[in-house]
Amino acid sequence: MSNQHIEELNDQQIVRREKMMALAEQGIDPFGKRFGRTANSAELKENYADKTKEELHELNETAIVAGRLMTKRGKGKVGFAHLQDREGQIQLYVRKDSVGEDNYEIFKKADLGDFIGVEGEVMRTDMGELSIKATKLTHLSKSLRPLPEKFHGLTDIETIYRKRHLDLISNRESFDRFVTRSKMISEIRRYLDGLDFLEVETPVLHNEAGGAAARPFVTHHNAQNIDMVLRIATELHLKRLIVGGMERVYEIGRIFRNEGMDATHNPEFTSIEVYQAYADYLDIMNLTEGIIQHAAKAVKGDGPIDYQGTEIRINEPFKRVHMVDAIKEVTGVDFWPEMTVEEAIALAKEKQVPLEKHFTSVGHIINAFFEEFVEETLVQPTFVFGHPVEVSPLAKKNPEDTRFTDRFELFIMTKEYANAFTELNDPIDQLSRFEAQAQAKELGDDEATGIDYDFVEALEYGMPPTGGLGIGIDRLCMLLTNTTTIRDVLLFPTMKP
């Protein structure tokens, strides 16, 4: 270690390094080795929850625990401390006459943040706190930096997102939120596996962005000397697997979109896409409701959930409404009668709906009305179906009214949580819609996709009638953990350097 590096350290860091070197001089590895423990903090509390101080003394049972030293107090020959593991904390009661002089020195010189292993008797203090009365301490790993201020946890937002490891150490609420996220994803997998779906993996690097309306990240493959994009969806590859006969598939994976960041958007996020052969959007609507209700029940229990003071009746059947009916209900404007694009634009101007250059059809205007007036009213879980064909390039047209598609989006608390439809399996229709998207791209629509000829070719081999679904995992996690920003459910959100 250079003198220059030592000079850059603050007093606490210097002292901790001196302690590290002192351990090494005593023949103790400052960064330890394997340590076998017999219980964690939660197991101890569960196993001995109903035992009194006297009963524990009579039992005389021992346990071996390990974790990070979070508090330490006492002087002379007796000390107390709290050890933190993944499940929580357990108190330590350390007496010099129980552990011996050398062991007690390890305890005395241990810093907050150090990892130690403890063997001892399970007991309860006079105050009633379950504890381990140590008979042996083992130094496991030295912390060379002091932890954030112990009484208030980590509160600086910038540090929380940049140094998630410190947030997890200091804020139990944050730690538990990410445990909930893992449990939620596991339960979604369990639900779909139980319905005989196969989990698959598809490429992250694509030759052409497709499967969604979004701006991609562009990268370069040096060996092949070609530009590639990070996927904006998993859809087109998953549907090729349906062509290949897999029938029921899903993928949970990272999606990348080179777009703005806000409370509900991060450039890198997690989605699940699900495809089921011989199904339509109504079957997928039922599947979506099942997935979300199963996940909610697994992590929140039965009944409604609270989100920022609003009771969400997630346990009840979700409302279902056609987009045109929803617009009429909120604005009074009726798009059921057929009209020209000029008439639709006049209605938009009358209602002061913002117009874009690529709004070249009535369908675009209908979608703009919905986004402007209806989305903000959808608080309880609501399936909105019947999107215009112009904004649904991969969805099948509704056979009774071909202006619209057999597509739905799920809205909760005014935000979209799922997007699904009866998949377009007509390769000729698919190519013409890709061509319309390419034209919109030329007119300035950055989110329009190009033409994926390989996918069109795959469809030409035949794809059975299929229903497909995409759910934003991060938003669902926000809902089920009662958080208002996506950064609080991403372990490592995108940050400026």
Swiss-Prot record:
Homodimer. Binds 3 Mg(2+) ions per subunit. Mg(2+) 2 binds at E416. It catalyses: tRNA(Lys) + L-lysine + ATP = L-lysyl-tRNA(Lys) + AMP + diphosphate. The lineage of its organism: Bacteria, Bacillati, Bacillota, Bacilli, Lactobacillales. GO terms for molecular function: ATP binding; catalytic activity, acting on a protein; lysine-tRNA ligase activity; magnesium ion binding; transferase activity; tRNA binding. Belongs to the class-II aminoacyl-tRNA synthetase family. It is found in: Cytoplasm. HAMAP family: Lys_tRNA_synth_class2. Its main location: cytoplasm. Its EC number is 6.1.1.6. It is an enzyme of class 6 (ligase). Keywords: Aminoacyl-tRNA synthetase, ATP-binding, Cytoplasm, Ligase, Magnesium, Metal-binding, Nucleotide-binding, Protein biosynthesis. It comes from the Bacteria. GO terms for biological process: lysyl-tRNA aminoacylation. Its cofactor is Mg(2+). One of its GO terms (cellular component) is cytosol. This is Lysine--tRNA ligase. It comes from Streptococcus pyogenes serotype M3 (strain ATCC BAA-595 / MGAS315). Gene3D superfamilies: Bira Bifunctional Protein, Domain 2, Nucleic acid-binding proteins. PANTHER family: LYSINE--TRNA LIGASE, CHLOROPLASTIC_MITOCHONDRIAL (PTHR42918:SF15), LYSYL-TRNA SYNTHETASE (PTHR42918).
